[in-house]
């Protein structure tokens, strides 16, 4: 949360728990868009990297598993992050027409890091199909990692 010693800046790399300035606000917009296309959306706003970043992926996985247990017919789970990149030599943005947009990145977890991801290959295929369409519409908008 912003304090006197820290005030939020759009270009900043610090995390905040203020929902008006966090990735949850992006999730609100994404949820609205997906709902407008007829998708049934559950937007979980659990903080997984607060108070500590260490272990956040495992906590996120627990949240996703809980959603899948309660809503087993879910077709898509999006674990949305705002990764703060302090390295100024890398600019995670792309120009689309006259607008500058944040670049999207899909990070596909595998079984290699110690956490089980039994469907990672299906996730990768799905992400590639989205990347292909996104890049047809807006070249360079979506990367896979």
Residue ranges and their predicted role:
Residues 1-75, 84-90:
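N-terminal catalytic or cofactor-binding beta/alpha core of small enzyme domains
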Residues 24-31, 120-138:
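Long, well-ordered alpha-helical scaffolding segments within enzyme catalytic domains
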Residues 66, 139-140:
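Short, intrinsically disordered/low-complexity patches at protein termini
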Residues 81:
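Anionic group-transfer/hydrolysis microenvironments
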Residues 86-123:
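A short, glycine/acidic-enriched catalytic loop
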Residues 142-145:
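Active-site-adjacent mobile loop/cap segments within catalytic or ligand-binding domains
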């Amino acid at each position: 949360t912003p304090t006197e010693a820290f005030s939020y800046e759009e270009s900043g790399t610090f995390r905040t728990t203020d929902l008006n300035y966090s990735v949850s606000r992006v999730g609100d917009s994404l949820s609205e868009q997906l709902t407008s296309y007829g998708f049934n959306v559950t937007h979980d706003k659990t903080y997984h990297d607060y108070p500590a970043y260490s272990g956040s992926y495992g906590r996120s996985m627990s949240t996703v598993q809980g959603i899948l247990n309660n809503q087993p017919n879910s077709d898509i789970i999006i674990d949305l992050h705002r990764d703060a990149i302090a390295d100024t030599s890398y600019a995670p943005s792309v120009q689309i027409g006259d607008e500058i947009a944040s670049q999207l990145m899909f990070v596909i977890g595998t079984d290699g890091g110690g956490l089980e991801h039994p469907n990672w290959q299906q996730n990768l295929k799905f992400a590639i199909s989205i990347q292909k369409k996104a890049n047809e519409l807006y070249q360079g908008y979506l990367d896979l990692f």
